[in-house]
Amino acid sequence: MAHADVRNAFTAAWVMQVSFDPLLLALSINPHHSSYGLLKDGRAFSVNVLKKGQLALAAHYGRPAGPDNKLALMEWTTGRIGVPLLLESLAWFECRVVGEHPAGDHVLVLGKVIDGKLLDSKAEPMAYRETGGMDGASALFPAVFGD
């Protein structure tokens, strides 16, 4: 995400394509997450698809923002619409926010894809199951689902 001169990145657990025409992606973010304010103000975001085996990178961007610049230690460039693009990723997409929808304790943010690039055609994408539950979501599921 980007707004004015501020850039940030976070690991999103849920990202999906929702339309071909126009090409739309959706991501889910906790509205109490510090990145949500930047996303709302900047109205743009990038999706950087991590490669299988880049768990340390996912963990780095999954930690709370705080005063440190999470982008400082990584190679990145600025995209056409000002959002950070990770040069180590498998692929990236630049998106303009076109809508939001409340979804329980998260918000679904809809983005129109403005640009994208495949950086490594031989790599496989990281899947959520490879993260080992680093977001702690498995602890939130009830032992038994009721009515």
What are these regions (language model features)?
Residues 1-147:
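Basic, polyanion-binding surface patches
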